[in-house]
């Protein structure tokens, strides 16, 4: 019995001697984290937390190391646990919000940032993160209300102005938002800002401004999504189809299923009377979006030129049903009816054309 007891005591002594020192583990983990050796840092923090599971700083640091390696779900779990014992809970909540943000869980990120922003209403980085989260959640009005009081002291902060500009556009103040994005783009040469400003001006039918911004975006970053399509549209709408054509061809090379690039290129070739070359692009556009009024209209124009008047009439009638106030389909349908020897139908369409024109003159420029 005495021999067995001594063996038990000896085993306990050896185990105690082999137990890692928590201070050394913490120091080793911090050193590894600071030099970017996150795998070692994670290993040492995990060992330490097996010994001292309520050590909040270590758990928060483990969350940060996991986040750096892209293990965001694990990082989030560690941050949540760290909130129970960490001395600086606000710092942990900030990191938790950032982990949600990087993961794309914007609702939870916004919740964390919003609570922190109430405690630190002048913190510009926090405001930027919250504002961007709100915009990406479709809550542009909320972002504008939160950011606007901070603008005076942050007007030279490009990130702040970019987020405010995107929020304004989403909230309906599109010209003001686009102007802010232009200022950011000129100051920072940020291609994304030029792209969003240019596409916004296009939506506002301000095509010259749109083209200037989109051309700059294309120069800065030709890999931006849809940049060739948008630039081609701006060139075409400023009366430069020759310059638009290569942009659309490049867009189709990058994405053969680009609806607008196929539609616009087909229309350019049709207007040039290169009808055989136009047909595959117009067909492709209609295949991509069979319900598109524009695609149906352009195909109807091709059919009319090719002498396929019955098919052209059917497509124009479909367009008019979906958009009865669009003038040009009525004009073309009247012409097609006369070619089909349907003068009564042609006369009815002519009367509709005159009515739409009169309405447009009373209201201002229309479609």
Regions found by a protein language model. Name each.
Residues 33, 60, 64-67, 94, ...:
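Position-specific recognition of the canonical hydrophobic site in helix A of tetratricopeptide repeat
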Residues 21-47, 51, 64, 68, ...:
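Alpha-helical segment of the N-proximal tetratricopeptide repeat
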Residues 22-23, 56-57, 90-91, 124-125, ...:
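Helix-start (N-cap) detector for alpha-helical repeat units in TPR-like alpha-solenoids
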